C-alpha cells in the first residue's frame, strides 16, 4: 500500500455519464480514483475535499479496452472507479456546477 499525502491526489476526476448523473439524485457520486487507493483513503479524501459525511464507498477495477491502431493492437489504461454515497443530511456536491434537476 502506498502512502498518498494529499487527498486531491486520490480523486482524479468525476465520471461523467448518463448512469452516474442519474445516481446523483440518490446521493451517490462516481469518481475516477488512483489505482493504489483503498476505500478508507477514498472516504477520507471525499470528506476533506468536499466537506460532506460519507456513508459508504464501493470500488470497481475496470480493465482497459484492447483497441486496434494502424500499427497493430494497443491497450487503454486500466482504471479504478469509486461510487461514494453521502449521508442524507450532507449538502450535495456540485460537481457539474449547478443543480441536478
From Swiss-Prot:
GO molecular function, one term: structural constituent of ribosome
Pfam families per UniProt: Ribosomal_L23
Record has ATP-binding as a keyword: no
Swiss-Prot/TrEMBL GO biological process terms: translation
Keywords: Ribonucleoprotein, Ribosomal protein, RNA-binding, rRNA-binding
GO CC term (a single one): ribonucleoprotein complex
Mitochondrion listed as a keyword: no
SUBUNIT field: Part of the 50S ribosomal subunit. Contacts protein L29, and trigger factor when it is bound to the ribosome.
Role this protein plays: One of the early assembly proteins it binds 23S rRNA. One of the proteins that surrounds the polypeptide exit tunnel on the outside of the ribosome. Forms the main docking site for trigger factor binding to the ribosome.
Entry's family note: Belongs to the universal ribosomal protein uL23 family.
Name this polypeptide is given: Large ribosomal subunit protein uL23
Gene: rplW
Amino acid at each position: 500500500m502506498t502512502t498518498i499525502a494529499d487527498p486531491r491526489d486520490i480523486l482524479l476526476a468525476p465520471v461523467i455519464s448518463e448512469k452516474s448523473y442519474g445516481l446523483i439524485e440518490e446521493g451517490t457520486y462516481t469518481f475516477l480514483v488512483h489505482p493504489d487507493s483503498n476505500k478508507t483513503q477514498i472516504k477520507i479524501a471525499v470528506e476533506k475535499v468536499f466537506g460532506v459525511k460519507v456513508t459508504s464507498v464501493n470500488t470497481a477495477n475496470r480493465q482497459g479496452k484492447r483497441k486496434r491502431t494502424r500499427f497493430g493492437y494497443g491497450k487503454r489504461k486500466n482504471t479504478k472507479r469509486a461510487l461514494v454515497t453521502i449521508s442524507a443530511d450532507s449538502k450535495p456536491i456540485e460537481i457539474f456546477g449547478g443543480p441536478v434537476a
